[in-house]
């Protein structure tokens, strides 16, 4: 081998090596590019319902989501606003109604509320399976596994050992792609019914619509279906009443046409509607929505960790972090924002209290009228006013922050709700007089205890039964879920199992 | 003379000439600078009340001001909203009430309205001199000449031949400097009473406050004074009730403490308050004021004529020129603005109608209760609710565009106003029943004619008298004013002398 050949060889080897390194670098960059631009597959098929499984791919998002655990305060709204127990007499909300807590508590709160009762086995208890619909990524997993009709058939207790992970990743993200998407079919159907072309939904739209899967008005529509064995069953399918539009009056017309009622009022006998939480609907009437702002823009601001930008999943009150939320668009001091929002809240609180007082008094006066022998014909216009007025009131305030999302629409609705309640009371004064009672003063409903007594809520019995349920069937559910690998036992750690009634002393 | 001397001389002459020209140029530039930076003296002393006199210095502003003559449509609000005649029964507004027209018609409308009656000489007629206060730059001229107490003493007809120029230049501009300034002392006093340091008012503040001289709530406070001859007289002094604050509730408290009433309601006998037009007060609760926007920013946008920038004095609806108003700050389409404003108006119209219907029915029911022998003690709480509810209603809608200036405050107030009216009606249903009448239906007030008949308005008599006044005393006033050089006769040219009643056929 001569020297020049050696040099040539060495050069060639170096060149080949360098090319190899370059190719390797190109390949690894291409892999990196793919990784950055493609969400990882958390689970190859179906729905990855355990939030913990998303941690390895989305550690920042997961950690911020877990911060919702800190939003753990129980605020007993029946104690703060006892009128509610009168207004909802005969319905679950008169039993127990708290201000919302973080997403982390969705399962715990659903189990703890006295509204879901104390089942002793999979086929009893007051509530249908539909009551789980918005509580957990186990819901889309189950819908995927058993079908939507089967999911919506049966009692709430049917899925006690299946639905165990609180609202989390797979509620809004596809487990194969990580992309935002609907996990609940009811929203897509409702959007189509209200004229939306699903193919034209943008990413920015989606940053609102994934929230709108749950933060909306809905009802449980009885739907007949036939199972594989040919047996006819009735599913109670979560349905959004959007076919006539999204306003309170549109939905009222929808429900009226369908002769739908949620319950018959225990005191006034009015055929009532219960608004759930039409947050998306009210938001869409407000100035932020009109300017293209999404839910996530304010409730899930972008955050920075080192060089990584991510979305904060500690969904809560944007006022907790004005610098990352309001101030990204508006120029003003934090104080100015707080004062402005406070005055909006104050106005709504005033009109809300006014309407609640009117409606509660009207229900009690209607009860008295029945007691004195009022006729169906006399009472019919009163009951219609009560149904309509209370619906408008409920629609306007049942969702988070309606006073901010759409302050003018909220105030308008509260004004009209109160007017209808007032008109019912004017009629009732005449009906009562007709039956010999002039100037009737309704009984005192100024405390939760007094109001629940008037509403006939057997609170102590409900608590006793709930406690028995929690120490038996609930423990069994959790054990089964852990054993089957559906629940990470760590999820239950450090949960104080708080409720409005855990400190209530029971009389012997 | 040698040649070099000649050259020297010629050079010197040229240099001196050039220096002279330069000095002249410097002087004329200095004069120009002064002229640009100093408003001209329209009149050496006192108030230049004839708007025509300002034309030579401010031709663009004058011409744009004169465009307010085009805003000449008469909208009879008693015809559009007949409830008003019931609500104001016993007070001037039940006689005649139109939507506002351009500043140019301030005098004509004040003379034409049936509210100012038909005086036959300087010391009779229903109204005090105070009713001229906001109508003309002749008012500050007169106050300057006779003193404020003398101005506010006597009947409206006292100044019929003095107050002849419609709202114009000297209402907001100083005749010696052209600067913005208060021409009415009541505003300065009210600002001081509400804690404002007048020395800290900025130019931008002034672009709102000159409007606030008139677009505010006020009342005529009886004030004793002694004239030069030692005679004690009572002036009715325009006073802004701001000492407790600017909200509706603040002012209500002020009036209650002072046991003030504007009139006793003819049907219900309630001691009523009439809101004037608290536009500044409501505006100051809204988002535009909170962001430092002035009245002039939207109602008097800057315009360009060649290289000259001037302020448009054709004060009217900013929606007539969205490009020069809203769009200087906001980015959106004109259509988006129109739709947004329309929905604000719609909400306010709904709650306003609701409250008016409730209040009108309550007044009529109260009238029936008195008729059936209700006692003062029974009626007292009803009358208090009527006074308070109607005040809140009136405060919320009496000014221009409250639905836009402060939509949330307007809706809140309408909701509370309606609630108070409703509570009065509930009490009245019991009082009527107590006096043997159950389920009373109030008489029909669905047209202006029906409502005015219920309110006891002698419309034909009022029109006949007004026509007589206009063909006698009014003509005399105008002749005297022209003769004394206080009125340019051209001002009256082309005025169609429109009113709500000019086309009303009188029965023989």
Curated annotation (Swiss-Prot), chains A, B:
<feature type="binding site" description="axial binding residue">
    <location>
        <position position="330"/>
    </location>
    <ligand>
        <name>heme c 5</name>
    </ligand>
</feature>
<keyword id="KW-0732">Signal</keyword>
<keyword id="KW-0560">Oxidoreductase</keyword>
<keyword id="KW-0106">Calcium</keyword>
<comment type="pathway">
    <text>Nitrogen metabolism; nitrate reduction (assimilation).</text>
</comment>
<feature type="binding site" description="axial binding residue">
    <location>
        <position position="103"/>
    </location>
    <ligand>
        <name>heme c 3</name>
    </ligand>
</feature>
<dbReference type="GO" id="GO:0019645">
    <property type="term" value="P:anaerobic electron transport chain"/>
</dbReference>
<dbReference type="InterPro" id="IPR036280">
    <property type="entry name" value="Multihaem_cyt_sf"/>
</dbReference>
<feature type="binding site" description="axial binding residue">
    <location>
        <position position="173"/>
    </location>
    <ligand>
        <name>heme c 2</name>
    </ligand>
</feature>
<feature type="binding site" description="covalent">
    <location>
        <position position="131"/>
    </location>
    <ligand>
        <name>heme</name>
    </ligand>
</feature>
<dbReference type="GO" id="GO:0020037">
    <property type="term" value="F:heme binding"/>
</dbReference>
<keyword id="KW-0574">Periplasm</keyword>
<feature type="binding site" description="covalent">
    <location>
        <position position="326"/>
    </location>
    <ligand>
        <name>heme c 5</name>
    </ligand>
</feature>
<feature type="binding site">
    <location>
        <position position="218"/>
    </location>
    <ligand>
        <name>Ca(2+)</name>
    </ligand>
</feature>
<feature type="binding site">
    <location>
        <position position="277"/>
    </location>
    <ligand>
        <name>substrate</name>
    </ligand>
</feature>
<feature type="binding site" description="axial binding residue">
    <location>
        <position position="405"/>
    </location>
    <ligand>
        <name>heme c 4</name>
    </ligand>
</feature>
<feature type="binding site" description="axial binding residue">
    <location>
        <position position="288"/>
    </location>
    <ligand>
        <name>heme c 5</name>
    </ligand>
</feature>
<dbReference type="InterPro" id="IPR017570">
    <property type="entry name" value="Cyt_c_NO2Rdtase_formate-dep"/>
</dbReference>
<keyword id="KW-0479">Metal-binding</keyword>
<feature type="binding site" description="axial binding residue">
    <location>
        <position position="215"/>
    </location>
    <ligand>
        <name>heme c 3</name>
    </ligand>
</feature>
<feature type="binding site" description="covalent">
    <location>
        <position position="172"/>
    </location>
    <ligand>
        <name>heme c 2</name>
    </ligand>
</feature>
<feature type="binding site" description="covalent">
    <location>
        <position position="134"/>
    </location>
    <ligand>
        <name>heme</name>
    </ligand>
</feature>
<feature type="binding site">
    <location>
        <position position="217"/>
    </location>
    <ligand>
        <name>Ca(2+)</name>
    </ligand>
</feature>
<feature type="binding site" description="covalent">
    <location>
        <position position="169"/>
    </location>
    <ligand>
        <name>heme c 2</name>
    </ligand>
</feature>
<protein>
    <recommendedName>
        <fullName>Cytochrome c-552</fullName>
        <ecNumber>1.7.2.2</ecNumber>
    </recommendedName>
</protein>
<dbReference type="GO" id="GO:0005509">
    <property type="term" value="F:calcium ion binding"/>
</dbReference>
<keyword id="KW-0813">Transport</keyword>
<feature type="binding site" description="axial binding residue">
    <location>
        <position position="135"/>
    </location>
    <ligand>
        <name>heme</name>
    </ligand>
</feature>
<dbReference type="GO" id="GO:0042128">
    <property type="term" value="P:nitrate assimilation"/>
</dbReference>
<keyword id="KW-0408">Iron</keyword>
<dbReference type="GO" id="GO:0042279">
    <property type="term" value="F:nitrite reductase (cytochrome, ammonia-forming) activity"/>
</dbReference>
<feature type="signal peptide">
    <location>
        <begin position="1"/>
        <end position="23"/>
    </location>
</feature>
<feature type="binding site" description="axial binding residue">
    <location>
        <position position="313"/>
    </location>
    <ligand>
        <name>heme c 2</name>
    </ligand>
</feature>
<feature type="binding site" description="covalent">
    <location>
        <position position="214"/>
    </location>
    <ligand>
        <name>heme c 3</name>
    </ligand>
</feature>
<feature type="binding site">
    <location>
        <position position="276"/>
    </location>
    <ligand>
        <name>Ca(2+)</name>
    </ligand>
</feature>
<feature type="binding site">
    <location>
        <position position="274"/>
    </location>
    <ligand>
        <name>Ca(2+)</name>
    </ligand>
</feature>
<keyword id="KW-0249">Electron transport</keyword>
<comment type="function">
    <text>Catalyzes the reduction of nitrite to ammonia, consuming six electrons in the process.</text>
</comment>
<dbReference type="GO" id="GO:0030288">
    <property type="term" value="C:outer membrane-bounded periplasmic space"/>
</dbReference>
<keyword id="KW-0349">Heme</keyword>
<dbReference type="InterPro" id="IPR003321">
    <property type="entry name" value="Cyt_c552"/>
</dbReference>
<feature type="binding site">
    <location>
        <position position="218"/>
    </location>
    <ligand>
        <name>substrate</name>
    </ligand>
</feature>
